[in-house]
Amino acid sequence: IGSGLVGSEMCIRDRYRTLPQHFVRDVILKATSNDMMNSIARSVLTLFCYDKNANDTSIDNVLRQCIQLISVFPLLSVYGYHAYNHYQRDNSLYIHRAEPTMSTAEVILSLLRPDRHYTPLEAKVLDMALILHMEHGGGNNSTFTTHVVTSSGTDTYSAVAAALASLKGPKHGGANVKVYYMFEDLKKHVKDWEDEDALEDYLEKLLDKQVFDKKGLIYGMGHAVYTISDPRQQILHGAVKKLALAEGHNDEFDLYERVERLAPKVIGRKRKIYKGVAANVDFYSGLLYSLLDIPCELYTPLFATARITGWSAHRLEELINCGKIIRPASVSYTHLRAHETGAYL
């Protein structure tokens, strides 16, 4: 299913990379939000009203709905940001039309930038990042949410909106933004980026809840599954390095590499139980988006633009398997008591 969805790029370009007439004006521009994930979720739920077969959960119809949503997610994300940037920040409004010949990465860069200009390297690196974020099994929070909500028999738009609500949380899709802001805070405390003692001191203060958000976390380090290394991060590392060299940001990339190398040592010294930790895919994602001049408000929406493909595949899988409704098992730790008639009257 997943390969079929990914392989439908030409179908997306030719037929579905467009929103209903006046949708941008009547929905996206009318009630702007300062949170792009909220904006996208609202738009997805509103698209239900434009679908004559919105509640039809047959496989063919759901596949059609999923392909349409995959195709318009870049538009919902970027247009939502432009609406916010104009109406709430009083900046110029840019609403470009998506070209059917462009890839998803090219559409994002073209719609986002006033002059629509981007380099082939920029598009290639962003495309790689989207692919790496596209799917990560059924155990992550938003994908599991898709399974749970789909098992109830609800429509595609409601299931995707629920997945968006999950990804919106800072413990899930918001991690790449946290990494970026953490490094911005590091730069305020450490003036010499080559001073490894100063870097280690800052990392220790992070773990001691003395700096940044005081949560005791080094964002971008560690993963529930990838405890030795995150293969997605290793691929992204090389791509971001090429882009940083091309854009003249060698020093900043070197800073990220130093923190990636030093953080496991600091965590090993500070934690009593230590099984190893490595940088995850979020570690370099924020730097990549920064090098592409993508605003922080769009970091998590770009995650969603990629992950909608995985959600779609898992929704179809759940429907094809015709499973029962998913509900958690519960264990009561209270003592059972015989019901006393009239006890609460």
Model-flagged regions — what are they?
Residues N176-K209, A304-Y333:
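Catalytic or ion-translocation cores adjacent to nucleophile or general acid/base/metal-coordination motifs
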Residues S8-E9, R13-H22:
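An N-terminal structural lobe/cap that precedes and organizes the functional/catalytic core
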